[in-house]
């Protein structure tokens, strides 16, 4: 869904993403990194991140969401929750404002050549380069959205490109766990007045094409209007395979979680089991009516009862 970076050769592995929108979406409040000199640790606090469980009436149909192009397929998840309810009308849905196309240029000492709308890289060893933005910095922090396709001239070799410390890798087709990562996506925060970004091209012969680049301000990271109703967990009732707590729905809408969807998850609202749905394309949720409610989410492990009986 998010098309986050894929730094590993193994297509079954996924690292912690540096994408600030994905971090907000998954509720990552504290980000620990290193200073530019590599000597010290830094800590960034992101206040407006998604709660693990919340209520909202700001929803869009999955068919509407799936039709969105990059970068709106990322930014719209900061504004709306996605549901499988196809009866939801598109009326009133506002696309993320303030996103503008921008031109970018790769500069390197050797081995990097611009050809029409693409860039050809032919280098025998790792090459440092610079990515320059053609836009007014305005002295404020911004978000850069960058995406392009990679055509590998030597399919039996890996291709790796690091931009602003974010690595994407396309593995050799002969690799047992070929990752099929032919589209590299990078989303990053830029500091005020930052116009140049460090790039490292891995050795090989390959082409960058279909490049898309956009910038926006950081408003989308600061907006918490999606999380309209707060879920308050009960520490005594939440244990083992069960999460329980209260929520006051301000309007009819949906209960949204970042708990991966599984058919063995059960949701009860005020003691009554409700129909679970897949929300945000991958997580469990359900419909909710306005008012104060007690919610219990329980996971029933398949085969657990039989296993206990046998043992």
Residue ranges and their predicted role:
Residues 7, 11-13, 31, 248, ...:
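Mixed-charge, polar/low-complexity N-terminal
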Residues 1, 22-31, 257-261, 283:
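Long, contiguous hydrophobic alpha-helical segments, chiefly transmembrane helices and signal peptides
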Residues 21, 35, 238-239:
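Accessory terminal regions of nucleic-acid processing enzymes
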Residues 12-16, 24-25, 30-33, 177-179, ...:
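Active-site-proximal structural scaffolding
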Residues 99-311:
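Active-site-proximal, structured, solvent-exposed surfaces of multi-pass membrane proteins
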């Amino acid at each position: 869904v998010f098309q986050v970076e894929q730094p590993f050769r193994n297509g079954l592995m996924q690292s912690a993403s540096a994408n600030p929108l994905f971090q907000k979406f998954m509720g990552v409040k504290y980000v620990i990194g290193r200073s530019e000199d590599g000597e010290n640790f830094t800590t960034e606090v992101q206040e407006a991140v998604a709660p693990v469980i919340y209520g909202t009436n700001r929803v869009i149909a999955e068919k509407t969401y799936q039709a969105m192009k990059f970068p709106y397929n990322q930014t719209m998840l900061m504004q709306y929750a996605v549901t499988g309810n196809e009866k939801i009308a598109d009326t009133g849905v506002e696309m993320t404002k303030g996103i503008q196309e921008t031109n970018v240029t790769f500069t390197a000492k050797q081995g990097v050549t611009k050809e029409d709308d693409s860039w050809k890289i032919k280098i025998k060893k790792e090459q440092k380069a610079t990515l320059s933005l053609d836009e007014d910095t305005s002295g404020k922090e911004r978000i850069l959205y960058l995406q392009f396709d990679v055509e590998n001239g030597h399919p039996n070799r890996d291709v790796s490109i690091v931009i602003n410390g974010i690595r994407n890798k396309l593995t050799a087709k002969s690799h047992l766990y070929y990752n099929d990562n032919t589209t590299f996506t990078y989303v990053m925060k830029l500091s005020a007045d930052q116009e140049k970004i460090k790039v490292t091209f891995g050795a090989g012969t390959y082409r960058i094409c279909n490049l898309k680049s956009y910038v926006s301000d950081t408003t989308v990271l600061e907006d918490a209007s999606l999380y309209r109703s707060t879920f308050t967990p009960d520490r005594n009732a939440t244990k083992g395979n069960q999460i329980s707590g209260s929520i006051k729905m301000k309007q009819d809408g949906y209960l949204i979680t970042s708990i991966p969807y599984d058919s063995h998850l059960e949701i009860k609202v005020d003691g009554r089991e409700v129909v679970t749905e897949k929300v945000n394309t991958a997580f469990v949720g359900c419909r909710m009516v306005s008012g104060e409610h007690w919610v219990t989410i329980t996971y029933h492990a398949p085969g657990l009862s039989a296993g206990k009986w046998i043992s």
